[in-house]
């Protein structure tokens, strides 16, 4: 079920995960450190998030409490203001966070035109694809099957627009991965930086 992909299960968190949230831009003001899931940053004392420092991760933030709404993927690094973690719209709202489990060196994802894994598809193995159109796939994406690895899909080419986190499992409909419209035009792997493999992609009918 879709809820399985979004539930902040402590069993799946990485022990080394660490993120620091700052109230103001450029790492100023009050800060709050997390090493595990937080379903309500407001209840934890963080009314507003102005900047983020990821010591180890990766993490996924959500616009709403209880890991719902628009998603924001954070990998190790600095995010000094809101537009460094989103380019879909001006959204400064992050209400919940959880670590992302990355435990596979292999990455394989299949994206389908229609719900329930039907219609045209594009299969991607160990590769990042900044534009589906450039590789001959111009269809919508209504369902996704992640066979291995952890991925983030984007609404537009060049890793722009709304972000959608894909962990291992089946997403039978676009609502399962939090999309209002079945539109994904680029995808990349979330991985530890020591894993470098040249990959392949296979658009198929």
From Swiss-Prot:
Residues 193-205 are annotated as: C-terminal arm. The modification N-acetylalanine is found at residue 2. This is Beta-crystallin B2. Signal peptide: none annotated. GO terms for biological process: lens development in camera-type eye; visual perception. PROSITE patterns: CRYSTALLIN_BETA_GAMMA. Keywords: Acetylation, Eye lens protein, Repeat. The keyword Endoplasmic reticulum does not apply. Residues 102-106 are annotated as: Connecting peptide. Transmembrane segments: none annotated. Residues 2-16 are annotated as: N-terminal arm. Belongs to the beta/gamma-crystallin family. SMART domains: XTALbg. One of its GO terms (molecular function) is structural constituent of eye lens. It holds the Pfam family Crystall. The N-terminus is blocked. Has a two-domain beta-structure, folded into four very similar Greek key motifs. Residues 17-56, 57-101, 107-148, 149-191 form the Beta/gamma crystallin 'Greek key' domain. The lineage of its organism: Eukaryota, Metazoa, Chordata, Craniata, Vertebrata.
